[in-house]
Amino acid sequence: MTQTKSNSNIVAIITMCFIFAMISFVTNMGAPFGNIWGFKYDFAASWGNLMNFTAYLFMGIPSGMLLKKIGYKKTALAALVVGIIGLALQYLSSIYGDDIKVNEMNGQPIALNLYIYLLGALVCGFCVCMLNTVVNPMLNMLGGGGNKGNQLIQVGGTLNSLTATLTPLLAGVLVGTVTENTSMSDVSPLLFIGMAVFAISFCIIYFVTIPEPNFGDSGSLMDSMKGALRFRHLVLGVIAIFFYVGIEIGIPMHLNFYVTNMGFEGSAAIGGTLAASYWFMMLIGRFSSTFISGKVSTRAQMTVVSTVALCLLLAAIFLPESVATEFQGHEIPVKVFFLAACGLCTSIMWGGIFNLAVEGLGKYTEAASGIFMMMVVGGGLMPWLQDVIAKSTDSITSYWLVVAMVAYILFFSLVGSKNVNKDIKVD
């Protein structure tokens, strides 16, 4: 009986790790897909990403409530069904609606398939929000909590970074160079892979027994949220996480756009490769952090990476485009490599900000986690704002927005993360 339960848990752990990877896979489709839609509609490059992350604003708290009401297993199953529907809608946009004009924007006719794609991106956003709510606590629980639970989360996080690296790379290979003939059908293999993994994961989770924790009374959730927001360092941390997700997504997305828009043969593939290198840098950063986190404080790590990120961004902004090097047979501005290197810095920011922001919250930590999940919407809003700036100026100038956000995170690390509300009872 014990052996059967152990085998069941192993299958569930492997499945959760793959789902952890799929969260990043689905999320990071936004930039390469944005290249396709942005070529046809110059205003739409970041809209899919915006819809994907806007879902967090509406689904963050409901996901937590759903988790308490129906448990891990049923929430995960529901999320996978939602994900399949979202990916199917995105595929539908490649075969239907291109010849059906719905309205005009700035004198440009807008076809129905764009709206179908955006709906699919929103639905996928609901999916990844629900999965994010499930995967971390489920892996921790399956590991028995403590160090073993954290180890499983780190394994899942590594796979998450790996798929974040591969997604823009695969999309770039499939597309090559974005032209007027490029469409969503060119990247349909990615959508089919996603749907297949979700379907297989659904079947596995359905038949695997997963222990459900006792969540207790959830009626005081809103009161807990109000209590959590009494802490200044949490409020400042919530703003920091909002900016962080915008930074994490915005840097590689606009790096991809910048290189792709150079328009040479294979520019989309090279743009995807450079964006993938950013995510690979994040993978290296997360792996390296596991060895130093026990010796160096979170505040010190955050201060260092924020400062280095500012230096890399300023170097990328001020370095002339004429300073270039050959990369895969083409002259590429050196500044793009400074942008890709920022992945080393952003790799530890999510965990670092969360750790500093919830320090000393006690019973309010769970409510704070729900608030944090809502603020992931920054990954849609801030890259969209960066895209607006890029359209009115240029791609590199838009990185001043990222500089401002990183500067705020440096402020939070040095000053804003200090708990000045120790008089509030948390037990």
Per-segment meaning from a language model:
Residues 11-39, 132-136, 251-259:
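Extracytoplasmic
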